[in-house]
Amino acid sequence: MNLSRRETRLNGTERCAAVSRALGPVYDVIVNLQGDAPLTPPWFLEALIEAIDADPDCGVATPVLRCDQQALDGFLEDRRAGRVGGTTAVFDAAGRGLYFSKEVIPYTGRGMKPGESIPVFHHVGAYAYRRNALLDYVDWRTGPLETWEGLEQLRFLENGAVVRCVEVQARGRVFWELNNPGDVPRIEAALASQGMD
């Protein structure tokens, strides 16, 4: 089977659905890694699989990483410079995604109180899906939020599906995604520090 990207497959979720449909019901859980996130550690994926295995009603799970001050500063600097950088996520107490944006959400302009945790979560470009959620996804039309933000996971939200946000820990590793040319040196340095240069 040729798994290469076809022009009719607009995003990774659609490509995963096409592969799942072609293979048939062999695999109930499909994991999607995105090529712009080479620093994604294996425990992020393990957390997704654990979350989806623990909840039979969970159709989609994706990792989120609480921003430290350096990551938040990177997001805010990208915005000030007019660059679209990574994606941020907000979710409820049960981990159900409320919204994903290429803007920094929630608003951070009020300043932080001493000892307060940064409430901004970096959405990591990886997903675990149940097969039925993928097949539903490709039957739905692209909505205005997905179109405006350019974020495929918003199609689930726009159609009333739950996207489970699974909080993960960096465990001392630098995590950043390749969104702009200026991200290349940062990612190369992180890979070198992990002995992968």
Question: What annotation goes with each model-predicted range?
Answer:
Residues 4-13, 17, 21, 80-86, ...:
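One-carbon transfer enzymes
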Residues 25, 100, 109-110, 114-197:
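Conserved alpha/beta core of the MobA/IspD/sugar-nucleotide pyrophosphorylase nucleotidyltransferase superfamily
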Residues 4, 30-33, 63, 137, ...:
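Short beta-strands and strand-loop turn motifs
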Residues 41-140:
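Conserved core of the sugar-phosphate nucleotidyltransferase
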Residues 1-50:
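Short phosphate-binding loop-to-helix
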Residues 7-10, 27, 55-63, 159, ...:
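Structured catalytic cores of enzymes that bind and process phosphorylated ligands/cofactors
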Residues 31, 38, 89, 127, ...:
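Residues that recognize and position ribonucleotide moieties
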Residues 1-2, 96, 162-164:
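Conserved beta-strand segments of alpha/beta enzyme cores
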